[in-house]
Amino acid sequence: WLNQPGMLGFRFSFTQPPQATWPTDGTMDWIWPEAERLGIPVALMASNYMSMVAPIAERYPNLKLIVDHLGRVGGKTDAECFATLPEMLALAKFPNVAIKATGAPSYSSGSYPFNSIHDYLHQIYDTFGPERMFWGTDITRMPCSWKQCVTMFTEELPWLSEADKGLVMGKAVCNFLAWDISE
C-alpha cells in the first residue's frame, strides 16, 4: 500500500467505541516501533490521549507523529476548547511531533474570521514554528466556506509572513513527511 501515490502513513482517530481503549490497553504498542522502523508517519486524533504522545515521541525519536485537530476536543470552543493547550505545546520539544490545524474554525464561537482563536493559533505557531504547523480543513463540519477556511490562514493571521503561509498551507507537511508531490 505504501507504493500507491499519496499513501504515506497511518491515521488513527480512536473515535469509535471499540477503538477508544486502543491507546491505553496495549493494542497500539506494536505500531510505534514498527512504524518507526519502516519510516511510516502516524497521525493521531489525540485530544483525549495527549499524555500518551510525549512518551511515544521520546521513545521513538525517528517516528514522525502528527497531532490532528490541534489536539482539541470537538464540541468545545474558545477558552474551554484550548484549556489543555499547554500540554500540547509541551510536545514541541520533540522534533518528530507536528500539529495539524484541521478544523480550526470550529473551535471558535465567533464567525469568520474567528478572531477568538487567533491568539491560540499564534501560540501554536510560536511554539512549533511554521515547519511543524500544518493547515487542514475537515470541511464537512466547518461553520464556514472552503474559501474562508483558507483565507482565515492566508489573509487573517497577520503574523504569518508570506514564506510562513507557504509552509503552513502545504510545503511544511510535504517536507515533514518527505512527500514529493512533483510527480
Regions found by a protein language model. Give the residues of each.
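Active-site gating/metal-coordination segments in enzymes
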Residues: 1-48, 55, 100-104
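Short, well-ordered coil/turn segments that N-cap beta-strands
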Residues: 5-8, 36-41, 61-64, 93-97, ...
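Mid-to-C-terminal alpha-helical segments outside catalytic/metal-binding sites
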Residues: 122-123, 127-134, 141-183
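Conserved, mostly hydrophobic/aromatic
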Residues: 10, 35, 69, 99, ...
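Aromatic-anchored helix/helix-loop segment that forms the rim or "lid"
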Residues: 85-127, 133
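Histidine/acidic-residue-rich catalytic or RNA/ligand-binding cores of hydrolases
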Residues: 54-58, 76-82, 109-119, 139-155, ...
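Charged helix-capping and loop-helix junction motifs
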Residues: 23-30, 50, 79-87, 113-121
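Conserved anion-binding
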Residues: 45, 56, 66-72
